[in-house]
Amino acid sequence: MKLAIKETPLPKYIAIEGPIGVGKTTLANKLATNFNYDAFLERPSENPFLKNFYKNPSQSALATQLFFLFQRMQQIEELKQRSLFETVRVADFLIQKDRLFAEVTLSNEEMDLYDKIYEHLIIDAPTPDLVIYLQAPVDVLMDRIGKRGNPNEQFLTP
């Protein structure tokens, strides 16, 4: 009797998701380093609205969300430009989750505007072949956030 083993192809695009402080960027970097993947990482330090958002979410939510949306779309364009045959790409964000976060943070009027922009931009976003969702208890997340010492995140509460 002969046993047939079917090889599963490697995913070409991996997205890692989860709450802040769970280790998305850490895992993406480890995968990129250990397996020679291309990493596409969130760059929250570039968002000039984030500090104010953490202090008072309602005042800076739309600007913060739109900045991240445009930043992620730029990264998605870079991702799409790379040949599917070159290497595996790993991202510490899932563009489809962006809208879910917006629903929680934006007013109805802001959400209407966000939706119009989102729908226009997301048309060609690739779908990941694999999504890894990380979880951790809230106390672990808060401990990790505190340990990384980002001054913008000092205002976060559970």
Q: Which ranges hold each PLM region?
A:
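Conserved lysine of the Walker
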Residues: 24
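A basic- and aromatic-enriched beta-loop-alpha substructure that forms the phosphate/nucleotide-
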Residues: 72-109
